[in-house]
Amino acid sequence: MARFQMSNLVGDPFALATVSIAILAWIITVVSCIIAQTKEAIPNFFWWSVAYQFCIVVGITAVMGSNTGHVYSTAIVGYAAAGLVCTTFTIDGLVTSKEGARQSGGAGLILLAMTDIVWIFYFGSTPQSRPRTYIDSFAPHKEQPSYRSSKPISHSYTPRPETTVSSAHQPHLYSSAPLSGFESSPMAGYNATTASSTGIQPMVGLQTNASTVGGDTAEIGQPTEYPYRAKAIYSYEANPDDANEISFTKHEILEVSDVSGRWWQAKKSTGETGIAPSNYLILL
C-alpha cells in the first residue's frame, strides 16, 4: 500500500495549491458559520455540507500525498460532484443573507465549490489529455506503476504459431537400406500435384521437410516506417519475461509505426524497437 509522503504535496504545485485553497476556504466557512450560529440558527443541511466538504478535502489530500490518484480517480470524481451539489445549495442560503458572518461563510463555500470543479476536471480527465499532461509535467514524482501492477491487455501484433511436429505423433522413419530398389518408385496413391498444394509430403522425405518447416518459422519482420512521434508522459520498465517490450523514461520521444491498438510498435532514438503501452504515451 502506498504511504503518505509530504514531499508528494510539496513537490506538486497543483496539489499544493488546490489543497491549500480548500483547507483555507473550509476554515473560513467553519469559523463564519460558528459566529453566525451564535446570532441565528443555521439549518442542519448547511452543517452537513461543511462536514461533507471536510471529508472530501481530507480524502483528496491523502490521495495526492500517497500519489494514488490514478487508482481512486473515479471515486474522487463521484464524491466531489456530490459535494459540489450540496455546496451549491448551501451557498444560496448564505450569500443572500445581510449578515456579514453568513456572507463570509458563503464566500468560503464558493472557494470550495471552485476547488471541487477543478478536481472533477483533473481527476475526470485521462492521463493522455493535454491539460493534465501539462499539469503533471511540473511534478516529476508522478509515475504510474510499471508492468508489475498492470496487466497487458493486448498486443498490436502476435507472432504466428510455430509449425512443428509433436513428439507424440512422430512418424516412423526408415533407413534407405531396406528400400533398395524403391527409391525412385512413387508411393501408392501419392499425387505430386496434390501434395504441393496441400503441403503433404511423402514419409520418406519427412525428416528433411520437417527441418525445412522449422526453418520457415523465422521472426516477424519489424516495421520499416515510423510515421508517428509520441512523447512519454510516464516512465515505463519493460517486463523481463517479454522480449518484445521496451523501457523508456518520462518525456522521452519515441517513433511509432501503428497507433491502432493498446500496445504500439515503437522505436527509440537509440534504434531499439519494441512494443510500448499506449496509455504511457501521447502523440505529438
Swiss-Prot record:
Subcellular location: Cell membrane
GO cellular component, one term: plasma membrane
Superkingdom of source: Eukaryota
Domain SH3: 225-284
Compositionally biased tracts (Polar residues): 146-169
Any Pfam family matching the protein: SH3_1
Residues that span the membrane, as ranges: 15-35, 45-65, 75-95, 104-124
SMART domains assigned to the protein according to its UniProt record, in alphabetical order: SH3 (SM00326)
Gene3D superfamilies in the cross-refs: SH3 Domains
UniProt-annotated stretches for the region Disordered: 138-170
The protein, known as: High osmolarity signaling protein SHO1
Organism encoding this protein: Arthroderma otae (strain ATCC MYA-4605 / CBS 113480)
